[in-house]
Every structure is written in structure tokens, then in C-alpha cells.
Regions:
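Short acidic-hydrophobic surface loop/beta-edge motif
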Residues: 1-10
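Short, surface-exposed, charged amphipathic helix/loop patches that serve as local interaction elements
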Residues: 13-97
């Protein structure tokens, strides 16, 4: 499976049903406070758990795959992987569809 992120193409592993559902649950929990409290509050621990899980699924050796990237670039790559795995489409304004 191939995605585009950080101005290049990345070859990533596919994702099966069970890990996809777990990733969805963790990713959803990161935004639950914002939805429930009608705020901009994000559970950053859950958000980074989702990023780490996505990177671990996407790459056989995540540390090697992201070598040389900044933390911000790693987060952007992880978010692109999550969007690909969970079929999240971007709106024209940059938010999720």
C-alpha cells in the first residue's frame, strides 16, 4: 500500500480488520473530550498512542523508517497513515470530511 506524505511516497503495510478497529477506537478517544464537551480539548496521550500504533502497523521497523525525521514530521507521517487506514478524507479547508 502506498501513501503520500512529507512530499514523498511511502510504502506501508496494509491493515487488517481487528487492528483497524483498535486504531479507530484509540483515535476516536483522542477527540472524545472535544465532542463531549463541545470544546477544542484533545486527549494528547490517546492521540500519540494512535500515531505510535499506526507507525507500528505501517512499518516492519518504524524506528528505521522514520530515521532522520523531526518529531513534527513523524507526527505528520503518522497522521497521514491514520487517515489512509481509517479512510478519512480531507475537506478543502483541511479538516476531516
Amino acid at each position: 500500500m502506498e501513501i503520500e506524505a512529507l512530499g514523498k511516497k511511502w510504502e506501508i503495510n496494509g491493515i487488517d480488520f481487528k487492528p483497524r478497529r483498535k486504531l479507530h477506537a484509540i483515535h476516536s478517544q483522542s477527540y472524545a473530550p472535544a465532542v463531549l464537551n463541545k470544546s477544542n480539548e484533545i486527549d494528547w496521550d490517546k492521540y500519540y498512542d494512535a500515531i505510535e500504533m499506526a507507525l507500528s502497523i505501517a512499518f516492519t521497523n518504524p524506528e528505521s523508517a522514520v530515521e532522520g525525521l523531526t518529531d513534527a514530521e513523524i507526527d505528520a507521517l503518522g497522521q497521514a497513515i491514520i487517515q489512509s487506514y481509517l479512510f478519512i478524507e480531507k475537506k478543502a479547508n483541511g479538516g476531516a470530511a
